[in-house]
Amino acid sequence: EGEDLTLEEKAEICSELELQQKYVDIASNIIGDLSSLPMVGKIVGTIAAAAMTVTHVASGRLDIEQTLLGCSDLPFDQIKEILEKRFNEIDRKLESHSAALEEITKLVEKSISAVEKTRKQMNKRFDEVMKSIQDAKVSPIVSKINNFARYFDTEKERIRGLKLNDYILKLEEPNGILLHFKESRTPKDDSLQAPLFSIIQERYAVPKSIDDELAFKVLXALLYGTQTYVSVMFFLLEQYSFLANHYYEKGDLEKYDEYFNSLNNVFLDFKSSLVGTGTSNNEGLLDRVLQVLMIVKNSEFLKLGKNGVDEMLNSKINLFNKIKEEIEGKQRMTLSETPENFAQISFDKDITTPIGDWRDGREVRYAVQYASETLFSKIGHWSDPVNVRERACPTLRMPVDQTRRNVLVFRKFDNSKPQLVGEITPYLSNFIDIDRDLYNAASNPDSAVGFKEFTKLNYDGANIRATFDQGRTVFHAAAKSGNDKIMFGLTFLAKSTELNQPDKKGYTPIHVAADSGNAGIVNLLIQRGVSINSKTFHFLQTPLHLAAQRGFVTTFQRLMESPEININERDKDGFTPLHYAVRGGERILEAFMNQIDIDINAKSDKGLTPFHLAIIKNDWPVASTLLRSKKVDINAVDENNMTALHYAAILGYLEIAKQLINLKEINANIVSSPGLLSALHYAILYKHDDVASFLLRSSNVNVNLKALGGITPLHLAVIQGRKHILSLMFXIGVNIEQQTDEKYTPLHLAAMSKYPELIQIFLNQGSNFEAKTNSGATPLHLATFKGKSQAALILLNNEVNWRDTDENGQMPIHGAAMTGLLDVAQAIISLDATVLDIEDKNSDTPLNLAAQNFHIDAVKYFIDQGADINTRNKKGHAPLLAFSKKGNLDMVKYLFDKNANVYIADNDGMNFFYYAVRNGHLNIVKYAMSEKDKFEWSNIDNNRRDECPKEECAISHFAVCDAVQFDKIEIVKYFVGTLGNFGICGPLHQAARYGHLHIVKYLVEEEFLSVDGSKTDTPLCYASENGHLAVVQYLVSNGAKVNHDCDNGMTAIDKAITKNHLQVVQFLAANGVDFRRKNSRGATPFLTAVAENAFDIAEYLIREKRQDININEQNVDKDTALHLAVYYKNLQMIKLLVKYGIDVTIRNAYDKTALDIATDAKFSIIVEYLKTKSGKFRREYKSSYGEPSLLQTNKISSFIDGKNIEHDHLQFINADNESSQLFSDTVSNIDVIGTLLLVDVLIRYFSKQGYISKESDSASDGITQAAALSITEKFEDVLNSLHNESVKEQVDLAEVHGRVYAALKSGRNSRIHQILCSSLKSISTLKPEDMEELVSVIMNSQSSVSLPEVTDSANEAYGEA
């Protein structure tokens, strides 16, 4: 139950259970932490595994359940194997890339990361998708995708951890994986391209509805397959790039060219397949998949409401567009032209042989390569050989490249390894081959020969600044070879900046000298004033770090002679040179400890000291050396509060543990954080019995120490099944009834564990088998509810109480039923048959729990024993309902045969037949219809009477309605086509209502139902009201009457208008709607739009259908559209109507103009607007000479400074409960910011008076308009209270109202306070006397408007949330 699981399998189980310590960290996060390992350089797998697993386990609570499941049982061998594979991979990648491949490598690694991240997430669930696809056409296609993806992942992982030579052999196998993956883009039957294009062409991945599970599963397969396809391309690019680089480093330029060429061909081939060739008839795979995604995204059924599908589609569209853009942006991987070798070779220099590689009788050849920005060509053919005779360092004459590219020059003697010897820049034609020889001379380990050759070449003009391998110069070369004569000469020739010149990895010459142990060179460079503490680029290592890890004592001493040296300098991860010296050995450590300024307990970023590292390294001599300083803190803790003893316990280092325990200052009971685990806890957790036994016997170890959750070492010993440790604990008298915080005893844990034999051991020790946890569970409860059959039977054989109930009123029999432990259930029933029908607090019986969890054998056993087959729990769930919902026809038949009540229903009125219909189980539906002696669908069903209030409806009515509503077309076809039930539930009307176009088409085209139906409301009415444009279009195109009456004397366009479906209105308007026709309310479509506050529709009708409407028309009460807009306080609509010339003087049946109505109702903003008829308030500024301007200065007051809210509205907004006295005390120093903040408070204060109540879940547009107007009017009240006309005249209240309305309507309610604040931005600061009045209005104003809620989220705007 965990012992045989792989690391990945266990990670999957534990992460799915959503346990606090997600085990998947071990397989992924640990690997991701390699850059911060507590050692430097290559680390053996054991140390890496230990350090990383410690960090991850110690960082979270040791949860009992996860530990029992093995989620904290760390398999070191597997982790070491993973780490070793990753180290091999890193080693390969650390090989230097040729310049030609660096950019390609960056592109590939970046793209792989983006694609593989989401592909791995999909991979976890793809097996489930495969298992659930039963469709005969689709299943084989999806299987091909699955098979290929599995093969790809398996092979990729298999080669990942190979050693270098094995890796090369595997990649170069004839007809091997590279060839197979290259063919994945061909139409071959076993390729990946074939099934992907098949899915696209057959439209298998385009769902017909939100419930089209098959199509959505195929869509997941298409996306998964496409991402795999892209991954294959990048994998191939990565491998060919690696092979090319490998052979470049080996000097095999023919092989380099071969793989360099393959690299480009793979890219171009896959690019053609993925993004096409740019012609209209050759679309790439990505374009086709994006088209499918857009079709699904624009489906009508996805517009009905928010769901996760839309989010998923958007993320995939973004991903594939990004990939497409990346691929399209790269025209090719290499320059297409292979350079011709036009070099003319002449020996013009007076440099005689032998010198360097120039020896008489050897043959020398040259080859060139073009370089243009980030693109490189293949390396051209080698020139004809030239025999070396007495002369060296020839001049190469080449024609100037017309395209102004750089030319890299390579040289090869005989069959030796080629070398890059230089670069010819544009416009130059002559190249003297001398600089590489100077570099080689500086690199010569024979210092005398090297110095002689260097002197000669330097005299003849060689460039000491030329760069070669990894950007290194002769300075680096001399530093590495240790040629102090050359370096001495160079120090006089070079500038100080050149002595500090870093290579591509940041290594300066002194880094190289220190890393090579060349103390003399180090000393020379220090004397010349180089930067002693300079750092490498990635790891930020100083020369001292490098000398320390190599153990070079003399080099260390020379470095320490510099007064500038920082002995405690930290690298990228916070490690000091002393940390590195742990790897260098005892002598270098002693040298460090003799230094006065050394910080012997220095901590890395993770809190690790050198002593920690010595223990992790299992190196007691090094640890002893540190201890001799008498300054080591042996109890120092890292970031997880882990001491050196913790690490020894985790890694199982018994001898180290003994040494540590014997130290006088040791504290063996320090606990980790936040897990609170001691060294003893860890030794048991990691199953190091020898270390655990030693610690248990140690007098200074607390054997009863509690970790987080109250877990003691005894609990862990049970969880991990450590029998030897348990025996030792019993012998030393450990209390066997220890309880965790949740009151788990060791026996509880044994009952849940994978070691049931421990139960008898504890029972023999007298353990209390009736002990209860906080939830009231006994050991028997836990054994049954955790599915531990053997444990439960052992407890039952010891005559434990099987009738105990837990906090849910459940007995062990309920647990056995829930987990399907048939043998345990049989044992309990044989002891006590009265528990057969016993109910828990949810009224669930064992039978019902077994049924709800689909344990068929247990269900049949309980029924055979006489259990109530019609048992129902508090929600009405019953066995028959469970199996029908699941689609288990055999069990439905079984329950029918056992005379189950076939009409039994749950609290929602749902019986087995409805569940079968809603879940698309046609086989169960057909079976039920065939059992007429037991089930009759014509029976009246009052369980769902609220859905059929006007009459009593039969099961058939609800069943047909459900089939249509839940888009189960096969069941619809059965009910309507096979059984001929055309009239039940009005299937065409229902299909139109819910927007199921394919069902509408079926009923019209195959069953020949009339598109106008047989009811008052036509299908077109339903589709229009619910905004199903595609259905509306189909019905009209098939002859539906657009002016046919709906209920209430309305037509289809009226229905669409009432729900503000503009697109439907536009379509109907273009297809013969009678705009003069009035409904039962005497309103035309135009008046209906105004009355319903459908602004967009009203604007459309006025702008686009002006010839069909009369803007001044009146209803039965002689009201015009303007009257109606005033009634609803819709200022936005009023502005629209006035703008397009409505007659504002028309009077209604009560002799009132629109202005009269606004005046009577005291709608001041509307009154002001209608009076001007211009829709604009006065904006000209009129200064008030008689009284001081209310808002003039713009100083930042002490009030704002004191409150620290100068630019922070939110902090002030949330201070709703401050009293008016607070405002009075502070108004004397308030300014512009304060004014705006007070407006924020104003809005929140008003809103709490209930502008929008919580009486309903939605509101009409008119309600929204009213709420917006009420807010604006209160805002106006505040401005009026200021007694300053200039303030009011500068604020356009009509504009404010429109913006507030728009914010409410769009759901952006949080913007309302910003709108009102911005309206005051042009106004200066409030004066104290006026602020008093403003505060008074804010505090005393009461809302007089109580309106229904606009939306649930509208509360946010008013401070109710």
Curated annotation (Swiss-Prot):
The keyword rRNA-binding does not apply. Residues 218-237 are annotated as: Helix H8 is the probable transmembrane region of the tetrameric pore inserted in the target cell membrane. Processed by furin-like proteases at both the N- and C-termini. The H8 helix is predicted to insert into membranes and form pores by assembling into tetramers. The helix is contained within a helical bundle domain that undergoes significant conformational changes during pore formation to allow exposure of the H8 transmembrane helix and transition of the toxin from a soluble monomer to a transmembrane tetramer. One of its GO terms (biological process) is exocytosis. SUPFAM superfamilies: Ankyrin repeat (SSF48403). ANK repeats lie at residues 470-501, 505-534, 539-569, 573-602, 606-636, 640-670, 675-703, 709-738, 742-771, 775-804, 808-838, 842-871, 875-904, 908-937, 951-983, 984-1013, 1015-1044, 1048-1077, 1081-1111, 1117-1146. Presynaptic neurotoxin that causes massive release of neurotransmitters from vertebrate (but not invertebrate) nerve terminals and endocrine cells via a complex mechanism involving activation of receptor(s) and toxin insertion into the plasma membrane with subsequent pore formation. Binds to neurexin-1-alpha (NRXN1) in a calcium dependent manner, adhesion G protein-coupled receptor L1 (ADGRL1, also termed latrophilin-1 and calcium-independent receptor of latrotoxin (CIRL)), and receptor-type tyrosine-protein phosphatase S (PTPRS), also termed PTP sigma. This is Alpha-latrotoxin-Lp1a.
